[in-house]
């Protein structure tokens, strides 16, 4: 029986707590949050779980095997490091930290102590992304030439990380899951429209040795909500639209063929407009994965 302590019961904490409670081989022993009113709400739903307004109570409990860090991003590094140094496994909400050096340090500590350090990249456990991976690995869409991701909405503006750290981490985790290659070059640009110097609109471009290009568009300033990833293969293409209630993944038998014309010294394009296939996916909560 794995005994878990949870730090934070704000926006995501209730979801993490509920899913841990539903696991047969797991017991949530304690939840800590600095706001007593949030802990009172927890007690209304899970009266048997111990609560505390002091995070030290979670770290110092010898019966707790693992700690879930579900707190503001600026606190991830400190809490995760302390948990690892206390000999406890760690699940941390994305993004893992506010910078690369802190993330690398946490990884090194976990390896040294032979502990599990896991980031809550929830999308990797959705039926939609699992189906995309299955299609890509089958060779159905051919060689991937490009991925184009859009993750925009009005808010929520964060106070401790910019829009790339907040939103692009979802898409980057999906990209790394779909393809084994890692980028050769990374370029990012963004702009801040508030007074805190935190970018609210940003664009990220990843280029690979194979010629693959990935472009991600993230924004907290859009009047509409879009959550879409387009995977372009040289045979077929996939569109993942997370806003769709049921038909989230569509495979397009569309594309083009380049026909060289040496005599006219130009390139001719032959377009293919085939069918659209909607594969069956399992629409279950990702945290149950």
Predicted features along the sequence, with ranges:
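N-terminal Rossmann-like dinucleotide-binding module
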Residues: 1-46
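Residues that mark the start of a beta-strand
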Residues: 3, 143-146
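Conserved SAM-binding strand-loop segment of SAM-dependent methyltransferases
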Residues: 48-55
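Beta-strand-loop-alpha-helix segment that lines the small-molecule cofactor/substrate pocket
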Residues: 66-124
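Basic phosphate/pyrophosphate-binding loop/patch that engages nucleotide-derived ligands
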Residues: 108-116, 130-144, 236
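C-terminal glycine/acidic-rich active-site capping loop/insertion
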Residues: 122, 235-289
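Rossmann-like dinucleotide-binding domain that binds NAD(P)(H)
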Residues: 154-224, 230, 244
């Amino acid at each position: 029986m794995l005994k878990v302590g949870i730090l934070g019961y704000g926006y995501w904490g209730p979801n993490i707590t509920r899913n841990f409670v539903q696991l047969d081989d797991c017991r949530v022993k304690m939840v800590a949050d600095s706001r007593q009113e949030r802990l009172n709400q927890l007690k209304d739903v899970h009266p048997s779980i111990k609560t505390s307004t002091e995070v030290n109570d979670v770290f110092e409990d010898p019966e707790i095997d693992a700690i879930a860090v579900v707190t503001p991003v600026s606190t991830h590094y400190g809490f995760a490091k302390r948990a690892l140094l206390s000999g406890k496994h760690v699940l941390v909400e994305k993004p893992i930290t506010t910078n690369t050096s802190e993330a690398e340090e946490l990884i090194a500590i976990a390896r040294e102590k032979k502990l599990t350090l896991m980031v809550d990249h929830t999308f990797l456990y959705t039926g939609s992304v699992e189906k995309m991976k299955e299609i890509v690995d089958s060779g159905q869409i051919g060689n991937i030439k490009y991925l184009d991701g859009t993750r925009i909405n009005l808010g929520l503006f964060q106070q401790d990380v910019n829009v790339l750290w907040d939103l692009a981490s979802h898409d980057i985790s999906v990209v790394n899951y779909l393809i084994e290659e890692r980028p050769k070059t990374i370029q990012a640009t963004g702009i801040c429209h508030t007074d805190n110097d935190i970018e609210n609109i940003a664009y990220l471009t990843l280029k690979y040795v194979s010629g693959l290009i990935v472009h991600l568009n993230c924004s907290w300033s859009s009047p509409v909500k879009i959550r879409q990833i387009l995977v372009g293969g040289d045979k077929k293409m996939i569109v993942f639209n997370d806003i769709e209630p049921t038909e989230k993944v569509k495979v397009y038998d569309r594309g083009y063929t380049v026909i060289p014309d040496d005599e006219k010294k130009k390139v001719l394009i032959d377009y293919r407009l085939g069918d659209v296939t909607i594969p069956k996916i399992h629409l279950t909560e990702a945290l149950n994965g």
